[in-house]
């Protein structure tokens, strides 16, 4: 198959001391609010690897639990996961700190501003706009949304992150 041929080719590159991208073994995540909980989906583009994970702070090993279905969270956790073939770790370890606060996993109501689940999924966006944890709008957009906390709550602080990535024409709000 193609993947086995690529693995064989990569072995030749490694034997010659040529560094090649191993990102095909890295894990991508999607965290979405579901009925007051967070659903954490882990995936690798390589179907021939095993995803192993921990939620106790330890580094995953080939003996860690095998990821077979989405994880459901009801509190703050740090998920660590990596891909394995046998006992060998192949990609970088994913370390995913999931934050829990009054808004986590609560519904976001909006009028035409797109899918805003990232506002309450417990994940802070990284410095990479491409991590899919950012909402984006154009300068001409009017953005309104409501976080439904389900009951009256005293809110002392509201934190909303923003990012600047000039190379991708992503800029912080002007106002």
What are these regions (language model features)?
Residues 168-175:
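Short coil-to-beta strand junction motifs in C2/discoidin
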């Amino acid at each position: 198959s193609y993947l086995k041929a690529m693995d064989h080719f990569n072995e030749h590159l490694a034997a010659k001391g040529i560094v090649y991208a191993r990102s095909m073994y890295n894990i991508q995540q999607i965290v979405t609010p579901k009925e007051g909980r967070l659903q954490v989906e882990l995936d690798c583009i390589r179907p021939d690897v095993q995803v192993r994970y921990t939620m106790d702070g330890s580094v995953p090993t080939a003996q860690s639990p095998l990821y077979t279905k989405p994880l459901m969270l009801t509190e703050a956790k740090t998920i660590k996961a990596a891909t394995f073939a046998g006992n060998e770790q192949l990609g970088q370890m994913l370390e995913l700190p999931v934050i829990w606060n009054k808004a986590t996993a609560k519904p976001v109501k909006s009028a035409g501003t797109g899918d805003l689940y990232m506002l309450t999924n417990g994940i802070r966006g990284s410095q990479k706009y491409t991590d899919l944890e950012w909402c984006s709008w154009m300068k001409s957009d009017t953005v309104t949304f409501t976080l439904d906390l389900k009951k009256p709550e005293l809110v002392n602080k509201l934190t909303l992150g923003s990012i600047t990535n000039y190379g991708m024409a992503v800029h912080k709000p002007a106002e």
